[in-house]
Amino acid sequence: IERELVLVKVNAAPERRSEIIEIANVFRAKIVDVGKSSLTIEATGDDAKLRGLEDLLRAYGIKETVRTGKVALSRSSRD
């Protein structure tokens, strides 16, 4: 099982916040901070999922991004 975590701070004028929140919901991401003109989003998943989220958020203006590398754990046996 492999996962990565990303935190993305994105420009979010009040009139565009609902659009950004909808995008976050599609990716099962969380809004972890709300600023005057920004939202910070936390998402976990594989590389493709996180790149997809970042690609969509880029249209709003990404202020900051921080991303872990892959973390992994072997699956349990099914016996």
Model-predicted segments: where are they?
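Long, contiguous binding/interaction regions
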Residues: 1-79
